[in-house]
Amino acid sequence: MVETGAGTNTPPQVNRFQKFGLSMQVFMLRRGWMGKASDFLLVITTKGRRTGRNATIPISYKMDGEEIITLNPGNSNWFKNVLAAGSAILEIKGRKFEAVGRLVTDEKERRSIFEKYRTDDPKIFERLFRIPAVSPEEELLRVLSKWKFIKFTKR
C-alpha cells in the first residue's frame, strides 16, 4: 500500500492520477462537496490485516433500512480487511461511525440485494455492474456470481 496526500492508502499498481483522484474524492466527500455522488459514495477506513495501518478509500454503498450495503468482486484490500477485522470506520454524508461488517452468503439475500441495485437506479446499476439493467436473467445471474456484498450495521 502507498500513502497518498489525503490520507488514503491505495494498492501500488494504481497510477498517480488514480491515487490523486481517490484522494480528492475522500477530501470532497468528507466536506460534503460531492453533491448527488454522496448518495452512493462513502469513505471507508479499514485496519490493514497484515500491516496494521489504517487505509482509507471511497467506495459505493446503498442503504437497506438501517443497514449499509457495499459491494466488491472480492479482491480489494478494503474488502479483505473488513473480512479479517469484522468492522470498519464508515463516513456517510459527514457522519463518522464504527460499523460491523458481515459477508452476505445466502443466495436469496444476494439476489435480493442485486435486484435492489437494478431497480432503484438503473444508471448506477449499469455503471457499477457494467451490464444493462434490462439484460436477460442468465446474463444478470452471470454478473451477480462475480460480486460479493458486505452488509454493515452501526456499532
Where are these regions (language model features)?
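Low-complexity, charge- and small-residue-enriched intrinsically disordered regions
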Residues: 30-42, 48, 130-131, 148
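Extreme N-terminal tail/first-helix region
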Residues: 1-34
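Amphipathic alpha-helical interface surfaces
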Residues: 57, 75-78, 110-113
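Charged, gly/pro-rich active-site loop segments
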Residues: 2-13, 95-155
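A short mixed-secondary-structure module that forms the rim of ligand-binding clefts
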Residues: 62-91
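Short conserved beta-strand and strand-loop elements enriched in small hydrophobics
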Residues: 44-45, 86-98
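Short beta-strand segments
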Residues: 39-73
